Design a protein with these regions (language model features):
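N-terminal alpha/beta PP-like core and its mobile active-site loop of ThDP/TPP-dependent enzymes
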Residues: 1-210
Length: 210
């Protein structure tokens, strides 16, 4: 519904159940990559052309491999949905020792690493899935920045009733008339005007307006 019909990524033991659902989906195609960094670049390129991209990694080793690409998407205003398949909520709450963790009983270390390079983050539970997932996706679309979704494997296996299908929300137009007037005055007063635009023209799809 947001505009991404392909999902990039690398299989891992904490995301396999979710990947089964992606592969079984009629309208979404799974694109496997050689590593997560490549997947993040592929999702970035897809987003630049189609408006938004999505990728899936596994907890720890997988999501950390994607950090460089997601940081690049943030720097260049490219909306990518980075989904991390994670251990069950029970494992995380009990602080169990599992592979790909730091072995200290904490499971939010990697999620915190995504906070400076994503515009929104969500820890998905059965209770908040229908509100948090639309929230972060709409934030990605509106702010043209990547977002991070932490998806415990037990939540991925839970059937959740969706009463209202997802619909992208359009951010209200801010008052930019004063800026338009300023640019117009400068163009009219210039003898040989040249317009040099930034990458935001691509990010916000403003080619026609320009």
């Amino acid at each position: 519904s947001a505009g991404a019909d392909k999902v990039f990524g690398v299989p891992g033991d904490f995301n396999l159940a979710f990947l089964d659902d992606i592969i079984a989906h009629n309208d979404i195609k799974w694109i496997g990559n050689t590593n997560e960094l490549n997947a993040s670049y592929a999702a970035d390129g897809y987003a630049r052309i189609n408006g938004i991209g999505a990728m899936v990694t596994t907890f720890g080793v997988g999501e950390l491999s994607a950090v460089n690409g997601i940081a690049g998407s943030y720097a260049e205003s490219v909306p990518v949905i980075a989904i991390t398949g994670a251990p069950t909520r029970a494992v995380e709450q009990e602080g169990k020792y599992v592979h790909h963790s730091l072995g200290e009983g904490t499971f939010d270390d990697y999620r915190k690493m995504f906070e400076p390079i994503t515009t929104a983050q969500a820890y998905i539970t059965p209770d908040n899935a229908t509100t948090e997932i639309p929230r972060v996706i709409n934030t990605a679309l509106q702010q043209r920045r990547p977002v991070h979704i932490h998806l415990p494997i037990d939540v991925a296996l839970t059937e959740i009733e969706i009463s209202n299908p997802f619909k992208p929300e359009v951010e209200p137009q801010k008052n930019v008339q004063s800026y338009i007037n300023m640019v117009q005055d400068k163009l009219e007063s210039a003898s040989q005007p040249v317009i040099i635009t930034g990458h935001e023209i691509n990010s916000f799809h403003l080619h026609k307006e320009l």
